Amino acid sequence: DELYAQQIAGYDKIGNIYSESELQNFRPGSPDPFKTVYAEGACAFILETMESAQKRNAEVFGSILSFASYEEPGDFCGANLGSEGFEIAVNDALAKAKTAASEIDLLVWSPRGDAQDEKILNVWRRRFPSAGIVTNVFNTGYIESASTISALAEVLFCLKKGIPIWRQKTGIAEIDNFPLPKSPKKILCAASSHVGNNFAAVFAV
């Protein structure tokens, strides 16, 4: 969730925050269960080049074709409900990936459950009318980019292992009843925040 100075100070006071020197040697699976690596949106992908992955015979779940972001102009004093900035990020990602909107088989997103969701849904309806749309229930609060990464990881894992994709039910028939592709080749992963931070990435499976 979001970070605040008071939260960090509290964790630090009880000795539950790694020091800078300790972080230099941090590895996943630390033997010390009490220590905490505290971050806003605790979700990340471990990335490497295709060449490196193939050398060590690693499982490849997908490859990143492009990434783009766009921040809305403004004073960040209110909700940003327009989809213009989000669409700029999407267009940039598609252009970098040399991919047409019609080639996108699946849109992975992170709904907030409020009016902000309409900006993504508007772009989905207009630009990707034949693409499935999916998220998962493991949202990390209002940290949209981390929630989207979490959903993307689930989708890529299911596709790799031949597991049917499970998607979060929204209660909106337009979304819940939309057919999902069995073997999507290109995925658009996208997120947008209420203060106008927009992210889009294109993946090949």
What are these regions (language model features)?
Residues 51-52, 114, 193-195:
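Short, glycine-/Ser/Thr-/acidic-enriched flexible segments
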